[in-house]
Amino acid sequence: QRQMCIRDSYNSLGYSKENGNVPGVSMTRFNLTSKTSYQINKILKIGVSIFANRRKNQNFVSDKYGYSNPVFYSRTANPYFYPYDAEHNYQYDYDILPGDEPDLKRGFNIFEERENTDNETIISSFNSIFDTELRFNDQWKLSSQVGIQWDQSSQEQYVGENTFNMRNIREDSSYDENQYIVPKGGMHTVNNATTSQITWKVQGEYKNTFNDIHDIQIMAGSEIRKNWYNTQFTAGYGYDPKTLTTKPLNIRNDKDAEKYKLHTKTYQENAFASFYTTGSYSFMSRYTIGGSVRMDGSDLFGVDKKYRYLPIYSISGMWRASNEPFIQRYKWIDNLAIRLSYGLQGNIDKTTSPFLVGSYDNVGLLPGYDKEQTIQIEGAPNSKLRWEKTASYNLGLDFSVLNQAINLSVDYYYRKGTDLIGKKLLPLENGFETMTINWASMENKGVEINLQTRNITTKKFSWYTTFNFAYNQNKVLKINTPDSQETPSLEGYPVGAIFTLKTDGIDSETGRIRVKAKNGKSMFLEDLYKVAIDEWGIGIYTPQVSTLEEREFYSYIGTSDAPYTGGFMNTFNYKSWELNLNFSYNFGAYVKTTPSYSLTKFDASRNTNRDILDRWTPENKNGKFPAILTACLLYTSPSPRDMRRS
């Protein structure tokens, strides 16, 4: 009689703590892994795997401008500002926000900010897998697997009363004279998100060899998956961390209530089902053909039944030429194979829906009346919504020689995506400006090369090299361009296309940027856009060109995605030591850089790039960079506030 025994077992427990570059920033991690398989009898094996993880991140709460980030603040702060006085009391920078005068109600001190805010995030996850395997013989095998997954993210934030962040929030809520929506005190928020999922998978496999020359492998199975996702957010104002109490908001109307939400909750549930089969046949280990068919279904496409399931499939073939007699006589050739495949893949865009989707809300329809429950429509329904599809064509070559000393792999691919989700303009009588439908299209094609070499191998020393090269070209074949879009359509261009106005240097008399029109004529921006004269001198201009005309101003210069990418890796081993030298490269991409200073909103009280020293001024008409301008496009000197701070 055969008794159940433990066949394999693996258990690990880990704990780690990392401190950030800034005091007060840290992360602790705890993880547990346990995998055990049991041999019940000759043909039955079961397994249990448990994965648990808990991560705690400690940080500070960042204000909406990002000033509490030391890296950002160090690049923008006034370099002459002292954060403490002689008695080590906080001093405040009242010029941290742009404006003509200091804001005495919104002083900023980065050390006070980091002392009186707290941001704690706890991420917990638990994943268990229960699998069963029935191996009847060397040819037949049946397996089943059940997976249960649970993930939770809990974030708790505290912003103290004595912080720039809280002062700024409260001042933004002011109205009339010294009246505020947000009460005095701090702010406490809790944001929780939970994801649960259960998966059941069953699969059967058959493989056999006939007459030592025919190899057959067949696999079929199904997978059913359901997941649940919910979030909950709560906020309290006027918070006192000692008494753990909050104060009510001074809500005047529905607009205030919408801006300062105290509680929100969302819930989402989805189900998926997949059925698949794959098979391959090989003759004399030289000629191999394979294929697969898969049916994926989702309740995201529940209106039209014919769109619920997407049949995806692939076919492939391979000729292992190195097993041919006329090549086997060349002993230095280890492997030579040519691969060819075609496949259709599907994708789900969960931001869209075939149903009329809305969110509940409580709105006061008329002044003086109680609020009524309403539904805010989020978009037009599309009963024909279906899967996005991608067709792929692949051709590959594998080549290795000299006892695997040199291994080369070359692949060419072409992929075309159809029925991609995109927005389509609708006649206004439909009640919606746009509808999300399956109609966009794009293509990708390219080459990938991988070369691995074994350069030196001895008893104590070895040197291996890996070289990767990839070229990719993509193009948008069909996309909707809204009438309000000011830049050219992406249709016919790469996804990362960059369109720019061609410049023609800096005007020597005014320091302003000149642009070059399509006819080659050099002019100012207001001439190009036919801007109406600002009669009142308050910086309000009205362009006299349509968006269609404006698109013609732009020229395509390139893409932000590098067409050529790759890497070069070297691995050196000496006894028990290993050294890795890795390099990567990207060619052919254009990078958009942010101007090193603002032409119209420059603040001399803030730290800035040295480029500004080489700007155009009446005394430096050969400056490399444009002049500082007012909203009326006139040269300006520093403001009284700037002169006071300098």
Segments and roles (model prediction):
Residues 29, 35-44, 49-54, 102-159, ...:
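Extracellular/periplasmic, surface-exposed regions of secreted and cell-surface proteins
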Residues 1-3, 7-60, 70, 125-129:
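Transmembrane beta-barrel wall of Gram-negative outer-membrane proteins
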Residues 233-240, 437, 454-560, 600, ...:
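Conserved small-residue
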Residues 57-75, 479-483:
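Low-complexity intrinsically disordered tracts that form flexible linkers/tails across taxa
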Residues 1-3, 7-23, 61-64, 89, ...:
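Residues embedded in well-ordered regular secondary structure
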Residues 560-591:
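Glycine-rich, aromatic-lined ligand/substrate-binding cores of catalytic
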Residues 1, 66-111:
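Acidic, glycine-rich flexible loop segments
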Residues 111, 165-167, 173-174, 586-637, ...:
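Extracytoplasmic gating/loop element in the C-terminal half of outer-membrane beta-barrel translocons
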